[in-house]
């Protein structure tokens, strides 16, 4: 064991989530292995028994049995399984005779590790960027607006009269993007602007937080940040009094 792992922190995270359904899913599995052939990781590994979905969620039952008294090496095993051996596609659940939502259990373990400060570095950085700037790429408001204006100028050379309205109140559609677009792929924004222009659509983009429609916080089950990201978008939509939010991600 190691003092670096706090059993109380583990149990404090799990206990509020241990409702009747959670307990049923953890306890009811009969290890029938009907989920095995539904898992692409299992099939791609040459049918390694450790890749069977039911086996992957054994950690939860173990954590509860040990009351969180595990070492860092054990947490590393959990990390490797929940991030590199499962992408939560839910195919296994469709074939489970008890309907055990293995993806939910995997997500719960991701949330647990996130609460302990353990998550892929790229995702951790993106989540911090959301908190600081409202988007995963840490694009400032000034850079975002400047990029939109540049996209309008470039695209209008091909479609005469093309405009990319910013903060147009009462527009029908508020368009949101993947934050990688203004950072690396502004041409994607131009192509959409051309479509809207030719279609004669009434649209706008927000200048403030809410224009990034990605939500990488979901992948590490950081529920608070995931909620903040969604709320940013809908808050801006309400402020601009638009009728629809278009999300391409």
Where are these regions (language model features)?
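Iron-sulfur-cluster electron-transfer modules
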Residues: 16-17, 23, 61-248
């Amino acid at each position: 064991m190691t003092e670096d792992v706090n059993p109380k922190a583990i149990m404090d995270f799990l206990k509020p989530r241990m409702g009747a359904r959670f307990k049923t899913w953890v306890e009811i599995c009969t290890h029938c292995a009907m989920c095995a052939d539904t898992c692409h990781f299992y099939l791609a590994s040459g049918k390694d028994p450790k890749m069977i979905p039911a086996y992957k969620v054994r950690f939860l039952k173990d954590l509860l049995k040990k009351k969180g008294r595990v070492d860092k090496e054990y947490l590393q095993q959990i990390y490797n399984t929940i991030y590199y051996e499962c992408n939560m596609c839910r195919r296994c659940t469709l074939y489970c005779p008890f309907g055990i939502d293995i993806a939910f259990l995997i997500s719960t373990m991701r949330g647990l590790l996130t609460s302990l400060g353990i998550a892929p570095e790229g995702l951790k950085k993106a989540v911090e960027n959301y908190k600081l700037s409202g988007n995963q790429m840490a694009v400032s408001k000034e850079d975002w607006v400047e990029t939109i204006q540049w996209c309008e100028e470039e695209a209008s050379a091909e479609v005469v009269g093309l405009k990319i309205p910013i903060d147009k109140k009462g527009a029908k559609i508020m368009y949101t993007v993947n934050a990688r677009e203004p950072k690396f792929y502004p041409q994607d924004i131009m192509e959409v602007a051309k479509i809207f222009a030719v279609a004669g659509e009434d649209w706008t983009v927000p200048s403030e937080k809410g224009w990034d429609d990605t939500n990488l916080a979901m992948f590490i089950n950081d529920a608070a940040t995931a909620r903040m990201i969604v709320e940013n978008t809908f808050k801006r939509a309400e402020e601009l009094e638009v009728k629809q939010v278009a999300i391409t991600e």
